Curated annotation (Swiss-Prot):
Signal sequence, renumbered to the chain: none
The protein's Enzyme Commission number: 1.3.1.9
Keyword Lipid biosynthesis recorded: yes
Residues annotated as catalytic: Y235
InterPro entries tied to this protein: Eno_Rdtase_FAD-bd_dom, Enoyl-CoA_Rdtase_cat_dom, FabV-like_NADH_b, Trans-2-enoyl-CoA_reductase
The protein, known as: Enoyl-[acyl-carrier-protein] reductase [NADH]
Gene Ontology MF terms: enoyl-[acyl-carrier-protein] reductase (NADH) activity; NAD binding; trans-2-enoyl-CoA reductase (NADH) activity
Function (record text): Involved in the final reduction of the elongation cycle of fatty acid synthesis (FAS II). Catalyzes the reduction of a carbon-carbon double bond in an enoyl moiety that is covalently linked to an acyl carrier protein (ACP).
Site features described as Plays an important role in discriminating NADH against NADPH, chain residue numbers: E75
Alphabetical list of Pfam families matching this protein: Eno-Rase_FAD_bd, Eno-Rase_NADH_b, Enoyl_reductase
Length: 392
C-alpha cells in the first residue's frame, strides 16, 4: 500500500515501516559516532522500549555498550490493510540492526502493568541473561489495570486547586487559542498517581529482586519532566506532577528494599520534546515549539537520543554524577536555566495566532512529530508501494 500520514487531533493514526526504520537507524548512527560508554551496562531491561526516551535508552545500551537488551512494549501488529503502530516498526528495525551488529536482544509485546508480562520477562532473563545491571522504566499510558484488584484506572491531565486558563496550540487546526482546564478532583489525582506514579516501577524492580535476577550494584531509573514556570500549572502543580512526585517516593523505597545489592535508583529529569506522550498535553505543543526556536538559536537543542546518551555518560555511568537536592539526575539544564527560560517567557507573552509561525519553530515541531510515525524523512520514498506487514 501507499502510506501517507493520517493525522487526527494530536495523534497520527498510521505509521510508515521504512520511515520508522530510518528514524531508528539515525539514532543508532548517532550513538555509533560517539565514544563507547565506559563501564557501561551489559544486561539491560527497558520497560517501554519502543518509542521516545525508552527506545533511545535501548539503542544507547545496545550500540553504545554492546548490551544484551530485553525490551517490553505494547504495540499493535500490522494487518494486510492497516499499518502497525510506530513502536512495532521501531522494534522491528531495532531487531534488524541489532542482529546485523551481532548483538543479543529479545522483545516482549504485552501489558507491562500485568504480573504475567513481569513473569515472562523474569523467565527470559533467567534462561538467557543471567542478571540485569540496568532497569529503565519509560512507560507512558493513559490507563493501568491494577493486577491485584483488576480495577482499571485512568490518568487525567488537570491542574490542582483551581481552574487554569492559558494559551495552547492546536496542531490539527494550526491555531493558537486559549484553553481553560478545570481542576482535578481528589479521585482524579489518586487515579493519575496510580497510572503514572511509581507503583508499577516498584512492582517491576521488586519482582526482579525477589526472583534473584538483579546484579549487585544494579541501577534503575524512571524518567520524568519537571519543567519551570510556564509548564508548572499543567505539569508540576498538576495531576501529572503529583504522579511524577510519587516516583521520588518509589526511588527511595527501592534503594531500601534492595540494599543487599547496593542498588541505585534514580529519577531522571529530561527535557521537553515532541513525543507521542507530550503531544497529548495541553500547553506543551506551544511551549515546545518555542523552546525549539530558542534552543536551536542557542545551539543547545537535543532530541531523545542526544539526551539519553548524555544521561548514560554523564549520569548513570559517571562515577560522580551530579544530583539535585532530591537525588535526581538532570539532563534538562539547557532548557531550564534562567537565561533560556527568560527568552521563552518573553516569546510566550508575545505569541498570538498572527505571529506564531514567526516566533516559534513550528516547522521543527511538526517535522519531529511526523518523524515519530516514520513520515517526513527526505530520503524515504512515500509514493512507493510498501508492504505494511513487518514481523519481529
Amino acid at each position: 500500500m501507499i502510506i501517507k500520514p493520517k493525522i487526527r487531533g494530536f495523534i497520527c493514526t498510521n505509521s510508515h515501516p521504512v520511515g520508522c526504520a530510518e528514524n531508528v537507524k539515525r539514532q543508532i548512527e548517532f550513538v555509533r559516532n560517539k565514544p563507547a560508554i565506559t563501564n557501561g551496562p551489559k544486561n539491560v531491561l527497558v520497560i517501554g522500549c519502543s518509542t521516545g526516551y525508552g527506545l533511545a535508552s535501548r539503542i544507547t545500551a545496545a550500540f553504545g555498550s554492546e548490551a544484551h537488551t530485553l525490551g517490553v512494549c505494547f504495540e499493535k501488529e500490522p494487518t494486510e490493510k492497516k499499518t502497525a503502530t510506530a513502536g512495532w516498526y521501531n522494534t522491528a528495525a531495532f531487531h534488524q540492526e541489532a542482529n546485523k551488529a551481532g548483538l543479543a536482544f529479545h522483545s516482549i509485546n504485552g501489558d507491562a502493568f500485568s504480573d504475567e508480562i513481569k513473569q515472562e520477562s523474569i523467565d527470559y532473563i533467567k534462561q538467557n541473561m543471567g542478571k540485569i545491571d540496568l532497569v529503565v522504566y519509560s512507560l507512558a499510558s493513559p490507563k493501568r489495570k491494577d493486577p491485584d484488584s483488576g480495577e482499571v484506572y485512568s490518568s487525567v491531565l488537570k491542574p490542582i486547586g483551581k481552574q487554569y486558563t492559558t494559551k495552547t496550540y492546536n496542531t490539527d487546526k494550526d491555531q493558537v487559542h486559549e484553553v481553560t482546564l478545570d481542576p482535578a478532583t481528589d479521585e482524579d489525582i489518586a487515579n493519575t498517581v496510580k497510572v503514572m506514579g511509581g507503583e508499577d516501577w516498584e512492582r517491576w524492580v521488586k519482582a526482579l529482586h525477589n526472583a534473584g535476577v538483579l546484579a549487585e550494584n544494579c541501577q534503575t531509573t524512571a524518567y520524568t519532566y519537571i519543567g519551570k514556570k510556564l509548564t508548572l500549572p499543567i505539569y508540576g502543580h498538576a495531576t501529572i506532577g503529583r504522579a511524577k512526585e510519587d516516583l521520588d517516593r518509589a526511588a527511595s523505597e527501592l534503594v531500601a528494599e534492595c540494599d543487599d545489592l547496593n542498588l541505585k535508583a534514580y529519577v531522571s529529569s529530561l527535557k521537553a520534546l515532541v513525543t507521542q506522550a507530550s503531544s497529548a498535553i495541553p500547553v506543551m505543543p506551544l511551549y515546545i515549539s518555542l523552546i525549539y526556536k530558542v534552543m536551536k538559536e542557542e545551539g543547545t537543542h537535543e532530541g531523545c537520543i542526544e539526551q539519553i546518551y548524555r544521561l548514560f555518560t554523564e549520569g548513570l555511568y559517571n562515577s560522580n554524577p551530579e544530583l539535585d537536592e532530591a537525588g535526581r539526575l538532570h539532563m534538562d539544564g539547557y532548557e531550564t536555566n534562567d537565561k533560556t527560560q527568560a527568552k521563552i517567557e518573553a516569546l510566550w507573552e508575545q505569541v498570538t495566532q498572527d505571529n506564531f509561525h514567526q516566533l516559534a519553530d513550528y516547522e521543527g515541531y511538526h517535522q519531529e512529530f511526523l518523524h515519530l510515525f516514520g513520515f517526513g524523512f527526505d530520503n524515504v520514498d512515500y509514493d512507493a508501494d510498501i508492504d505494511p506487514k513487518v514481523n519481529w
